[in-house]
Amino acid sequence: MKTGKTSTAAKFPKALLLGFEVGYLAIGGVKPQPINKWSEFKQVLKQLKDPKAHELYSNIIIDTADIAYDLCEKYICNQAGVSAVNELPYGQGWSKTSKEFDECLRSIPQMGYGLVMISHSQDKTFTDENGSEYNQIVPTLGNRPRLIVDRMSDVIGYAHPVEEEDGRTH
């Protein structure tokens, strides 16, 4: 069942949707820009510096931050000529990926745009210090990128669909 995360984000005024995953084709009222490579995202960031872009857009939507981070990681690997970030010695791959992801995302609000980042969620089971298990809804975004996203976020919200007796969801 869909929750409408992208549809909700698309209601932000003058929004540009950077579609790292396809799922925005039926959403009206928002300008979608497909992103298939990190270099394409970096090109969009350059274009957003233009004053004309500020006339068109006030808010930038990243859909999803999970895939954006994966593409960032691939970009760092390609730059270094390796197939996985852990092939770079002394944790350089992880630190370069985190730095690139952080700097690119932070550049959006630094240019004066609002930033909306979308991730999926999952229900995970944890164990407390007394050995009791409990469930918590957490983003599917990995720990490294989540630290970056959390630090930048003013609001973190979770959405889930509610089904009415007549079968409608909202």
Listing of model-derived features with the role each one plays in the protein:
Residues 7-9, 107, 148-149:
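Hydrophobic/aromatic ligand-binding patch that stacks against planar heteroaromatic rings
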Residues 62-92, 130:
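Conserved P-loop NTPase nucleotide-binding/switch module
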